[in-house]
């Protein structure tokens, strides 16, 4: 045993051979899953449908955040944009453009 002590003093790296292995690496706990989104079905436009058809004013049971419109909404589309336009009762033009 005294001989081992001399060897360990002379060659300190020998101590690594008999040390217990480090504990296994544990992956961090996973984040909770995101809540599921409501899935909406896409409606594909037929070639025969007119893309510039005025839509009805949406009906809702809650009060609208903006004043109601005097004209129905109009929808215009291109290959990469969707534009919805309407005019409120006080004459303000509201345009929403979605870039796809």
Curated annotation (Swiss-Prot):
List where in the cell it is found: Host cytoplasm; Host nucleus
Q: What are the UniProt keywords, alphabetically? A: Early protein, Host cytoplasm, Host G2/M cell cycle arrest by virus, Host nucleus, Host-virus interaction, Modulation of host cell cycle by virus, Phosphoprotein
Q: Which GO terms describe its biological process?
A: symbiont-mediated arrest of host cell cycle during G2/M transition
> Which residues are the signal sequence here?
none
Main location group: host cell
UniProt keyword Phosphoprotein present: yes
Task: Give the family this protein belongs to, as stated in its UniProt record.
Answer: Belongs to the papillomaviridae E4 protein family.
Q: What else is known?
A: The major E4 form is first synthesized as an E1^E4 fusion protein from spliced E1^E4 transcripts, such that the first few amino acids of the E4 protein are derived from the N terminus of E1.
Role played = Contributes to multiple aspects of the viral life cycle including viral genome amplification, suppression of suprabasal cell differentiation and egress of newly formed virions. Induces host cell cycle arrest at the G2 phase by associating with and preventing the nuclear entry of host CDK1/cyclin B1 complexes. Inhibits cellular DNA replication by preventing loading of host replication licensing proteins MCM2 and MCM7 onto chromatin. Within the cytoplasm, associates with host kinase SRPK1, a splicing factor regulator, and inhibits its activity.
**Subunit arrangement?**
Assembles into oligomeric complexes. Interacts with host CDK1. Interacts with host SRPK1; this interaction may favor expression of late viral transcripts. Interacts with host cytokeratin components KRT8 and KRT18.
Which protein, by its recorded name, is this? Protein E4
> Native species of this protein?
Human papillomavirus 13
């Amino acid at each position: 045993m005294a001989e081992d002590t001399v060897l360990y003093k002379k060659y300190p790296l020998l101590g690594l051979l008999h040390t217990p292995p480090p504990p296994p690496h544990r992956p961090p706990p996973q984040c909770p899953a995101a809540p599921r989104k409501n899935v909406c079905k896409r409606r594909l436009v037929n070639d025969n449908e007119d893309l510039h058809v005025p839509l009805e004013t949406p009906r809702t049971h809650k009060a609208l955040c903006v004043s109601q419109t005097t004209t129905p909404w109009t929808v215009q589309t291109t290959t990469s944009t969707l534009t919805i336009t309407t005019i409120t009762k006080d004459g303000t033009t509201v345009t929403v453009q979605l870039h796809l």
